[in-house]
Amino acid sequence: MIISFISKELRDNAINEFLGMQNLAPMSLMILKTILTSFSVAASLNDLPRFLIERIIYTSENNILCMFGDFVLHFIIAHEEPPRAQDGTIDWNLISRLQLIYVGEKNAS
C-alpha cells in the first residue's frame, strides 16, 4: 500500500526517528513505526495483520482511523478516483493508496 503524507512536517515526524522522538512518546513512536511498516508492505487493508485490521474504524466514506488506546492515525483515500463497488460505495478491498493526515492523541485539541 502506498502511504503519502499531507505535509512534509508530518512525514518527517512519522518517519524520522529523531524528529519523532521530539514530538511523540517512545511507545507511540514504536506503535507508529509498526503501523507504517505494516501499511507499506500490505497491498490493501485486507492484507494488514489482524491486530491492525481490528483497530481500523471507517469514519466516513473516505476516512479511516487506526487507534491504539488514545493514540490515533487518521488516513484518507489518496486515489484520484477511488475504486467503487457496484452499489457505488468505496470498495475498500481495492484501496491501495492512503494519505496520512494526522498522528497523535485521539482527544487532542
Language-model segments: what does each one mean?
Residues 63-109:
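Enriched for short, Lys/Arg-rich terminal
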Residues 41-64:
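A short, surface-exposed loop/turn module that caps and links secondary-structure elements
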Residues 22, 51, 85-87:
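Short linear functional motifs in flexible/disordered or boundary regions
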